[in-house]
Regions:
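Arg/Lys-rich, positively charged N-terminal/basic patches that mediate binding to nucleic acids
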Residues: 1-33
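Localized chelating/binding microdomains
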Residues: 6-10, 29-33, 37-39, 57-66, ...
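Short amphipathic alpha-helical/adjacent loop interface patches that line ligand
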Residues: 15, 19, 35-42, 91
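Intrinsically disordered, low-complexity segments enriched in polar/charged small residues
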Residues: 17, 59-60, 68, 91, ...
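Short proline/glycine- and basic residue-enriched helix-capping loop/turn segments at helix->loop/beta transitions
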Residues: 43-47
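Basic/aromatic recognition patch in beta-strand/loop cores that engages polyanionic ligands
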Residues: 50-80
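Enriched for short, Lys/Arg-rich terminal
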Residues: 71-101
Length: 101
């Protein structure tokens, strides 16, 4: 059975905010490239997602994986999907960010 990747509203907002920030600092081309790489990393989570770090301390069933040492992808493995919950950049406090989700 194929597993789909779903971007939850918080993750979509994170991607938009991250694009806006990088575009302002480094240009739209660089921002677009970075977002594409994050999205590709999220899509690869369909391959053995259970191997990633489990973080039940942050919420039931949550897992995290680092991205290019600058971002953290927070996700949950469901029966038929990987739900991308948040994408946090630059060492943001995971507990605080997830509390707002």
């Amino acid at each position: 059975m194929a597993v789909e990747v779903r971007f939850r509203p918080g993750a979509r907002t994170d991607l938009f905010d991250l694009y806006t920030y990088i575009a302002a600092q480094s240009g739209r081309e660089r921002a677009g490239s970075y977002i594409e790489r994050i999205e590709a990393a999220c899509m690869r989570l369909t391959h053995f997602p259970e191997r990633r770090t489990r973080r039940d301390d942050l919420g039931p069933g949550l897992r995290t994986v680092g991205f290019e040492r600058r971002a953290t992808i927070v996700f949950r493995v469901e029966k038929d999907a990987v739900d991308i919950v948040r994408i946090l950049y630059g060492g943001r406090d995971l507990e605080m960010a997830l509390r707002d989700t």
